[in-house]
Amino acid sequence: MLSGGEVDRKRVGEIVFADRGELAWLEALLHPRVVDEQARWRTEQTAPLAVVEVPLLYETGGEARFDAVVVITASEEVRRARTEVADIMERQGRLLSDDEKAGKADFVYVNDGSLEDLDAFVRSVVQRLAP
């Protein structure tokens, strides 16, 4: 799995997404470390607003660590066009639905438009959140 100090992410994905026990083991190993690293990083920030991307935020109960949550999603067609993962539906099957995430979020954006549209959304969120 390790080659020259690098992780073969594709192979790890094949293993853990084929065996829920292996996935649980990996998540139990990684998630506490990621949370600790995010907390350390946040203490170092001096800007009035800091952004953290957390792919499994709601699934891991992590939303309580943040003042606001922004959910950015896209239609299934757009997701398929943007990903190289062949078994995306298997992986998405363990996630909350977009509707559930949107219902919990403070801000929601469906990213099916242009980069300019996304930039405008981000600017509007920053304007509302920045002191």
Predicted feature residues:
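ATP-dependent small-molecule kinase phosphotransfer cores
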Residues: M1-L49
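Short beta->alpha linker loops
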Residues: V7, L29-L30, A74, L96, ...
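Short alpha-helical
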Residues: G21, R33, E77-V78, L96, ...
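Residue-level signal for inorganic ion chemistry
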Residues: L26, V51, Y109, L118
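ATP-dependent NMP and nucleoside kinases share a basic, alpha-helical "lid"
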Residues: V35-E44, L49-R82
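C-terminal non-catalytic interaction appendages of large macromolecular assemblies
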Residues: S75, D87-A102, F121
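Phosphate-binding beta-loop-alpha motif at adenosine-nucleotide cofactor sites
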Residues: G103-D117
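C-terminal alpha-helix
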Residues: S124-P131
